[in-house]
């Protein structure tokens, strides 16, 4: 029985021993397996792969071999084509792909076949970036080893022949020592551009086929070339392979480059050097241009090329004279920014579908003979639109005229934006025969001449349609409630509304301008306190800041009223002299002649019924002509015009101006013909008199018009809102005076593309719906938009019509365009937004920014743009060499002054893979700092917010608040919470007040406080702190963190290696102990078994008590 018990005990102990041993063995195997897998995966990561060519005649040809895991192998030719060869050649520094070879053309390799079914797009940077079956996976033998033939370009040449100079002619290419031609199949201007650029012959003017420059001989090297125009050499375009074609030499292609074309442009048969029929010199002969599609964009390019930068009109068959000879160009289509007419799209040279009765012409201007004005509206910012071109004056026809066009006029005249546009009623008997027709402005142009499709001249217009405008800067004054027309309460018209002016907002200089504008002479007195009675309605809340020399009140600067509100009891009034615009005419000198007055804009002779020497003496003094010598009768200086003023002056002779004399007109008798006042003054040779303004106005031009005003329109008609930049956001349209949204029904990339194009934001990356950028307000203007993508404006697309929809604002449409840009700093801590790798969002993707040329000024721009601080540091680059990320831009160099990174020069946008060592890593200064302290952990508390540094008010400031600041700055604990500007008074905003921290907050702005910037404190109450420690710089803290991480990683590897070694040693030791048992008896067996079981139990117990994984022995 005891023996049986011992056997059972023995078996039980053996089972426990085996279970414990198996547990340890499995763990050891798993660790080793994981480490091995990591090593294998790392070896396939890309850094240890190499590419070479073997068996070829030179370094740029041979069998393709790839080195993976320190072992060279070949590539199978399945799917092997020119796109793949392009990648191989470029990767090896032999940029031109010549031929794709297979079937062991360069002899069969040996060893591994690493890749099969390789498929490239052609733009990959390495062969292993292309798709393939997987490393070592294939279904071929070495008899299918792939090869390539590349070229570094040294053995390739190109030229143009048979054209008379090196920049035009038949294209010929030298390859393998033989010259050959290019087939014209699919040959276009893109191919010609590559050829001209490669030969340094300027831009491509034209291309030709059908052996236009004669048939060549020898090989035909290329056929069906596909170029995008950006390639550096013709052989870098996609093609089927050298020498592969289905042509003969009757299809040889040729090109004409700008430097070889001898192209010139001129105008003939015009009235000026900047107008007439257009003619182009091509291949030594002058010819004309057909007017098919001829518009203002084409004319703009032609005028600019001729040195007459403003296109007045594009002339077609109606006005241009007929030329002779060739018609060189037809269907010209320019964008308007081209520098030469032949850079625009057009048919091939000499191909046309018209006769000389359709010859195109232009009327251009150098700008000196163009004038725009508003007339008859009470100020220079309102009235009928008049245009003067080359001394010819005309009106603007109201046909197709709207608020967009009016807005351009107002802006061009410095009159703000358009408040309204209307038509002016005139009788047909006073009609003008000269008209300006404007068919399309977008509202953003700087001048009317920049609008599209405007024509000048002889087309008819209904004479009830003269365009009239009122601009926002229009201010028309009047005097109301006075005894005479030139005195009274000042009232000013803004748009259609009249209002009074507060006496504190109107100076003597402003009164002087008002009197001059009203043709009322000079100011006599300025009266406040509603001297001429209280007005009603609007009181304008603006101060007139005139200097006194302005001709109109609307030309004076205005500013918001500085003293708050005003009532009608303070309406200002003015008394003007009225009669100071007076002159002598028809005399032999400026100091003698017939007396004429200007009253309310009209000049007329003064009746002599009450004219005497006292009046004459004041006038001579006023005109600086000495004293009056005589007042001859009988109209010795002529009778003058029909207008004779009957006003009677009652001067005493002591007044300085005629306006100071008493004047009466009431009841004055009629003046008979010839009864006009005259005077001869003594003269004063030391002074001269400038002639008075002799202009007259036609009373009929002041006829009141019947106006159909409409709501103001802003300068923009389309915008993107709440997207973080001008090229992303909710789409909003301005229509009928209101901004509104677009419904997302049927909204797609074609629609979004039109929006992006219209806003000059590139192309559409995403067409968002469901109010992705938040719900808008106001009208929903458009629904079910269906664009084809070619429209220039979103409202040109098909839709239900303005305001017709079945949506709500939760369906507001939005877009993200390719030119939308954003900025961020990426760190391992997702909550850290002011330190990390610098990335920009562009063209729909995030990419890093290179560290080349990165300066503190650039870092400061980044930190300010992100709202982090006004400065920062360039952090050490990441040491991780296994990661490659896309980089967008490098060599950013910000000068002082830019607000955003987008304003700084850099290298061009170019997306490429970059290692972390090439990227920019930035640490912005903390949003909180201590100033004027004895250490960097004491001082006045300042916070970065809203783009500037500001202070914290000491109301409620205590040790808990200081504790948060010290912890946030890494300065230990707070020793003191300073008050009353303990470290001096700061400047700028006081950002926070009534801060009430508990003491455990992460940052000061996590504490309760008043709203940002709302404070009733002065800087004498600036808060401060004194902390217990001197803080390490943020950079050193990051360095310490990285060093700790590296040290911890090394320690972990060493510990793991020791553990594995210990486990292996333990297993071997137990095996030796088990062998010794067989010779040691039962007691030894039992002791070993119990010791093993006890060890397993203690290890398990230790694991449970030690969650950190510390496997130290428990005593």
UniProtKB/Swiss-Prot annotation:
UniProt cross-references to InterPro entries, sorted A to Z: SRCR, SRCR-like_dom_sf
SRCR domain mapped to chain residues: 51-151, 158-258, 265-365, 372-472, 477-577, 582-682, 718-818, 823-925, 928-1028
Transmembrane parts of this sequence: 1045-1065
Cytoplasmic side: 1066-1115
Oxidoreductase recorded as keyword: no
Entry comment describing in which tissues the protein is expressed: Expressed in monocytes and macrophages. Detected only in one population of monocytes (CD163+) which is in advanced maturation stage.
Extracellular side: 47-1044
Positions occupied by motif Internalization signal: 1090-1093
Keywords: Acute phase, Cell membrane, Disulfide bond, Glycoprotein, Host cell receptor for virus entry, Host-virus interaction, Inflammatory response, Membrane, Phosphoprotein, Receptor, Repeat, Secreted, Signal, Transmembrane, Transmembrane helix
Membrane topology: Single-pass type I membrane protein
Bridged cysteine pairs (disulfide): 76-140, 89-150, 120-130, 183-247, 196-257, 227-237, 290-354, 303-364, 334-344, 397-461, 410-471, 441-451, 502-566, 515-576, 546-556, 607-671, 620-681, 651-661, 743-807, 756-817, 787-797, 863-924, 894-904, 953-1017, 966-1027, 997-1007
Annotated glycosylation sites: 105, 139, 936
Conditions for induction: Suppressed when monocytes are differentiated towards dendritic cells by CSF1 and IL4.
GO cellular component, one term: external side of plasma membrane
One Gene Ontology biological process: acute-phase response
Signal peptide boundaries: 1-46
Chief place where the protein resides: membrane
Domain of life: Eukaryota
PTM annotation: A soluble form (sCD163) is produced by proteolytic shedding which can be induced by lipopolysaccharide, phorbol ester and Fc region of immunoglobulin gamma. This cleavage is dependent on protein kinase C and tyrosine kinases and can be blocked by protease inhibitors. The shedding is inhibited by the tissue inhibitor of metalloproteinase TIMP3, and thus probably induced by membrane-bound metalloproteinases ADAMs. Phosphorylated.
Molecular-function GO term, any one: virus receptor activity
Localization terms from the record: Cell membrane
Subunit structure comment from the entry: Interacts with CSNK2B.
Domain notes from UniProt: The SRCR domain 3 mediates calcium-sensitive interaction with hemoglobin/haptoglobin complexes.
Reported function: Involved in clearance and endocytosis of hemoglobin/haptoglobin complexes by macrophages and may thereby protect tissues from free hemoglobin-mediated oxidative damage. May play a role in the uptake and recycling of iron, via endocytosis of hemoglobin/haptoglobin and subsequent breakdown of heme. Binds hemoglobin/haptoglobin complexes in a calcium-dependent and pH-dependent manner. Induces a cascade of intracellular signals that involves tyrosine kinase-dependent calcium mobilization, inositol triphosphate production and secretion of IL6 and CSF1. After shedding, the soluble form (sCD163) may play an anti-inflammatory role.
Name this polypeptide is given: Scavenger receptor cysteine-rich type 1 protein M130
């Amino acid at each position: 029985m005891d023996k049986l018990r011992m056997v059972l005990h023995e078996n039980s102990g053996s089972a426990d021993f085996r279970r414990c041993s198996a547990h340890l063995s499995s763990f050891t195997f798993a660790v080793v397996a994981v480490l091995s897998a990591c090593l294998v995966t790392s070896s396939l990561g890309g850094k240890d792969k190499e590419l070479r060519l073997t068996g070829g005649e030179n370094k740029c040809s041979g069998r393709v071999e790839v080195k993976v895991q320190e072992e060279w192998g070949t590539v199978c030719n399945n799917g092997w084509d020119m796109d793949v060869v392009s990648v191989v050649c470029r990767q090896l520094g032999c940029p031109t792909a010549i031929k794709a070879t297979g079937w062991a053309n360069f002899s069969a390799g040996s060893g591994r076949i690493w890749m099969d079914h390789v498929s490239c797009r052609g733009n990959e940077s390495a062969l292993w970036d292309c798709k393939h079956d997987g490393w070592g996976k294939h279904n071929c033998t070495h008899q299918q080893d792939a090869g390539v033939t590349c070229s570094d370009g040294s053995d390739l040449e190109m030229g143009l022949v048979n054209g008379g100079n090196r920049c035009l002619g038949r294209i010929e290419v030298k390859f393998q020592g033989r010259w050959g031609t290019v087939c014209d199949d699919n040959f276009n201007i893109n191919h010609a551009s590559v050829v001209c650029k490669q030969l340094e012959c300027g831009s491509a003017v034209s291309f030709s086929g059908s052996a236009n420059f004669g048939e060549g001989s020898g090989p035909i090297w290329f056929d069906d070339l596909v170029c995008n125009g950006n390639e550096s050499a013709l052989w870098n375009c996609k093609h089927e392979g050298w020498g592969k074609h289905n042509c003969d030499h009757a299809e040889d292609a040729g090109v004409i480059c700008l430097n070889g074309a001898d192209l010139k442009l001129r105008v003939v048969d015009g009235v000026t050097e900047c107008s007439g029929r257009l003619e182009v010199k091509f291949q030594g002969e002058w010819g004309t241009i057909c007017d098919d599609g001829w518009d203002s964009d084409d004319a703009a390019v032609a005028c600019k090329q001729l040195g007459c930068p403003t296109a007045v009109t594009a002339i077609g068959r109606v006005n241009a004279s007929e030329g002779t000879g060739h018609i060189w160009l037809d269907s010209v289509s320019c964008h308007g920014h081209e520098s030469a007419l032949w850079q625009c799209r057009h048919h091939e040279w000499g191909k046309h579908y018209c006769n000389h009765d359709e010859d195109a012409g232009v009327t251009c201007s150098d700008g000196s003979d163009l004038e725009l004005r508003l007339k008859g509206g009470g100020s220079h910012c309102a009235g009928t639109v008049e245009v003067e071109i080359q001394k010819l004056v005309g009106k603007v026809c109201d046909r197709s005229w709207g608020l967009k066009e009016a807005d351009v006029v107002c802006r061009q005249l410095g009159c703000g934006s358009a408040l309204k546009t209307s038509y002016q009623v005139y009788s047909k008997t006073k009609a003008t025969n000269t008209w300006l027709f404007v068919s399309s402005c977008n509202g953003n142009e700087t001048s009317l001449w920049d609008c599209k499709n405007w024509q000048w001249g002889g087309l008819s217009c209904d004479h009830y349609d003269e365009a009239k405008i009122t601009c926002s800067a229009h201010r028309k004054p009047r005097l109301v409630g006075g005894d005479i027309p030139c005195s009274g309460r000042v009232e000013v018209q803004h748009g259609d509304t009249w209002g009074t002016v507060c006496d504190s907002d109107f100076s003597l200089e402003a009164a002087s301008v008002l009197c001059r504008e009203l043709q009322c002479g000079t100011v006599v007195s300025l009266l406040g306190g509603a001297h001429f009675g209280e007005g009603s309605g609007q009181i304008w809340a603006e101060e007139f800041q005139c200097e006194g020399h302005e001709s109109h009140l609307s030309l004076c600067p205005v500013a918001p009223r500085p003293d708050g509100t005003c009532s009608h009891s303070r309406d200002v009034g003015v008394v003007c002299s009225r009669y100071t615009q007076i002159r002598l005419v028809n005399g032999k000198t400026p100091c003698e002649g017939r007396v004429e007055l200007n009253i309310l804009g009209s000049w007329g002779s003064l009746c002599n019924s009450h004219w005497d020497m006292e009046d004459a003496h004041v006038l001579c003094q006023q005109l600086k002509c000495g004293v009056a010598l005589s007042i001859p009768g009988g109209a010795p200086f002529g009778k003058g015009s029909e207008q004779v003023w009957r006003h009677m002056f009652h001067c005493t002779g002591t007044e300085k101006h005629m306006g100071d004399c008493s004047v009466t007109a009431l009841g004055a008798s009629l003046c008979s013909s010839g009864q006009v006042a005259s005077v001869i003054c003594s003269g004063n040779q030391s002074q001269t008199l400038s002639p008075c303004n002799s202009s007259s106005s036609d009373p009929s031009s002041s006829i009141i018009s019947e106006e159909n005003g409409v709501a103001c329109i802003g300068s923009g008609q389309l915008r993107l809102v709440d997207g973080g930049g001008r090229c992303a956001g909710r789409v909003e349209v301005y229509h009928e005076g209101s901004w509104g949204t677009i419904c997302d029904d049927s909204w797609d990339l074609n629609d979004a593309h039109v929006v992006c194009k219209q806003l000059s934001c590139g192309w559409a990356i995403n067409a968002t719906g469901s109010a992705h950028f938040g719900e808008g307000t106001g009208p929903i203007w458009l629904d079910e938009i269906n664009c084809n993508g070619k429209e220039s404006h979103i409202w040109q697309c098909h839709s239900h019509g303005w305001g017709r929809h079945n949506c709500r604002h939760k369906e507001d449409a939005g877009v993200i365009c390719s030119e939308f840009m954003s900025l961020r700093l990426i760190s391992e801590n997702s909550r850290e937004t002011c330190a990390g790798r610098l990335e920009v969002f562009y063209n729909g993707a995030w990419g890093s920014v290179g560290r080349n040329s990165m300066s503190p000024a650039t870092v400061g721009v980044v930190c300010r743009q992100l709202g982090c601080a006004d400065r920062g540091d360039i952090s050490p680059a990441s040491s991780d060499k296994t990661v490659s990320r896309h980089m967008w831009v490098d060599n950013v160099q910000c000068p002082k002054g830019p607000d955003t990174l987008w304003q700084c020069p850099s290298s061009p946008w170019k997306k490429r893979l970059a290692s972390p060592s090439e990227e920019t890593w930035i640490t912005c200064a903390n949003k909180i700092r201590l100033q004027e302290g004895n250490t960097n952990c004491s001082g006045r508390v300042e916070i970065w917010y809203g783009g500037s540094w500001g202070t914290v008010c000491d109301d409620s400031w205590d040790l808990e608040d200081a504790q948060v600041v010290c912890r946030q700055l890494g300065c230990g604990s707070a020793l003191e919470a300073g008050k009353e500007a303990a470290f001096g008074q700061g400047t700028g905003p006081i950002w926070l007040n009534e801060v009430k921290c508990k003491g455990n907050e992460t940052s000061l702005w996590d504490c309760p406080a008043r709203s940002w910037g709302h404070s009733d404190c002065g800087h004498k109450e600036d808060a401060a702190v004194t902390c217990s420690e001197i803080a390490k710089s943020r950079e050193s803290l990051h360095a310490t963190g990285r060093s700790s991480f590296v040290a911890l990683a090394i320690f972990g590897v060493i510990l793991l290696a020791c553990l594995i070694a210990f486990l292996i040693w333990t297993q071997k030791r137990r095996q030796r102990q088990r062998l010794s048992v067989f010779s040691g008896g039962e007691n030894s067996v039992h002791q070993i078994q119990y010791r093993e079981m006890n060890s397993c139990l203690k290890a398990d117990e230790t694991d449970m008590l030690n969650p950190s994984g510390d496997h130290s022995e428990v005593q």
